[in-house]
Amino acid sequence: EITTRLVGSEMCIRDRCNIPHVSHHTEAISGYCENFAKEHGLRYYRDVAGNVVIYKKASAGYENHDTVILQGHIDMVGAKPNASGHDFLKDIINIDEDALESGYITAVDTTLGADNGIAVAYMLAILDDDTIAHPPLEAVFTVDEEVGLLGASALDTSVLHGRYMINMDSEEEGVFITGCAGGLRSDLMMDTVMDKTENAVFRIITKGLKGGHSGSDIGTGRPSANVITGRVLERIRQTADIRIVSLKGGAVDNAICNYAEAVISCTADYDRISELCAIMTRELREEYAGIDDDILIEAKTADNHAEAASEGDTDRIILCLRQLPYGVISRNACNINMVETSLNPGVMLYENGVFRLGYSIRSSHASAKRELADRIRNMAEYVGGRCEESGDYPSWPHRHNSLLCRMAGQVYNEMYHKDPAFEIIHAGLECGIFAGKMPELDIISYGPDMYDVHTYDERLSIRSAERVYDFTLKLLEKL
């Protein structure tokens, strides 16, 4: 059964949970894929970035069929509770054994990495099974998708010869993705002057938020802990003189931040700061009722012997946190449920005199993406800072005459007696990179049911994973 492959065998998710593989640290998991190819006598290609392509010849009777590319990424987002001591660079991901009985694979207090470990499990299972009917296959394992699609961008696609590509980096069974937004990372940075402060020092903590994926979850209206921190600092500043000692919120720009801390020097006393935090907690819970019900703002005393940003630099930092937009910027005029453009400040950091805001910009329109990037750059220049852009990737345009999508719909209907949904999504997929490099490539993206990806509540439905695997085998048989 695929359940065995997913959870208990050589090719399972558990295997890859034993190999640390957060973004930018994928050498070991690339080696795992390379060794798999060697052990199975399969031709492979590995580039300097760490991308791996494994080739498998067609099964009997499929030698003259068009080649199919199977594709997924091997890096994962590392998210954990703030109190966790888990080190994603060396510690394994521990699967919650009790959750298996309820039908889900999840990890203990960390992200699971089913995004996109499930694609790796599928591809290795297919490559390992010589009983499957399939055309020539090219299994593409890319690195650093979660930090700007860097692996796909670096891959020399001249090593690929497929006509069709099946990307397995989607998170809802029965929903076939046929297009996606483009994206860009933008880091606003500002150097500050720090000196000793004699005022009381407090830690302002924003927690209890759901967080989520800055693409697929941004349309829910979930708040960002980084944005809320800016609101809290502004409220305190209205009643007292404050200076910022440090800020920390979020680890990656493509996740909605669910926890943030601000350490401030302040002329107000603890009781006043604590009262303001309680007031804002009540206000925010009312504002986000039904969206994020457990928001909590709390204050704690901290070491008074600290250096803090100057008053002017503190004002400039708060200005950056308050004035740039957050969340959905625009929606599709014909489909209000479809987000077209968004902005997410996933990373907030102030330490050693340097302030940084890391943004994920997404849009279906290159011009709108550029407009937001320019606004961030303008703000950086206004406060005397600088801006660095990276990870610019194109949108994936919907192909109206896709044979692959038509075939996938037919197979799904035959197997489950209902039609799938076809959608264009706001999240960025590597499909856009491949579509740009290989314009004739016919692409579809799908995957099993996953929930709360990019958070430590991430979980994968085992039953759904089984069905999607069976569907993939049947689709390969038909191509």
Stretch-by-stretch model annotation:
Residues 18, 250-252, 262-263, 296-308, ...:
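A short beta-alpha structural unit
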Residues 134-225, 233, 237:
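Fold-level recognition of mixed alpha/beta catalytic cores in primary-metabolism enzymes, strongest
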Residues 222-239, 268-270, 315-322, 330, ...:
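His/Asp/Glu-rich mid-to-C-terminal helical/loop segments that flank catalytic regions of hydrolases
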Residues 9, 333, 340-353, 360, ...:
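Zn-dependent metallopeptidase/amidohydrolase metal-coordination segment
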Residues 22-66, 423:
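A non-catalytic alpha/beta surface segment that caps or lines the substrate-entry region
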Residues 195-199, 218-248, 268-342:
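Acidic-enriched catalytic cores of C-N bond-cleaving enzymes acting on peptides and small amides
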Residues 62-163, 189, 198-199, 311-315, ...:
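Active-site metal-coordination/substrate-binding segment of hydrolases
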Residues 1-8, 13:
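Single conserved hydrophobic/aromatic residue that forms the stacking wall/gate
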